[in-house]
Amino acid sequence: MNESSDSLPLEELEKAPMPSIFSSLRATVSKPLQSVLDIEHYIKCNQRTEMLTQQYRKLMNVDTKLAGNIKRQSIAICPSIQFLPKGRTLEYFDKETYWLMLDYDHVISLVLDEKVEKASHSKYAMAVYRTISGKGLRILLKYMRPAGCTLTATELHLSLIHI
């Protein structure tokens, strides 16, 4: 594993490696995104993503198992790690991206638009979008390591989960 424990200043975050993208939730071959615009394209402009999202939302009320199969065909972005091209487990860890994802499910529709709008204005938010169900919110953001942090990327993320 090649996990960095170095802290990056804010200006260096712009040069940090980009997250990996997989062609589906089950794929093991990935490539790094080239830019933040790639994320926007895959989420907001990609015809395949749009088609799968529409199919998923229609099927959720009819057949949740079939809807789940549709969801697994969707692209997958791993914000925190740039993987080596062939692999999807920690043994294929290549680089830390200094990104993380906040994932909120079952957000009350009354406040969802407000939350999307508010999160979109954060200087750390790289992408803000509704989940495939239309009832959740995802925020991909950049972070800086705390000064003097010697944890590996995995240790840092695990410690944040348990706060």
Positions of PLM-derived features:
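Conserved small/polar residues in nucleotide/adenosyl-binding loops
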Residues: 161-163
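Short acidic, S/G/P-rich loop/turn micro-motifs used as interaction or catalytic elements
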Residues: 107-110, 146
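Short amphipathic alpha-helix segments
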Residues: 109-123
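DNA replication initiation on ssDNA origins
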Residues: 1-98
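Mg2+/Mn2+-dependent nuclease catalytic core
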Residues: 155
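Acidic di-acidic motifs
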Residues: 96-108
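Histidine-centered divalent-metal-coordination microenvironment in nucleic-acid enzymes
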Residues: 102, 120, 126-151
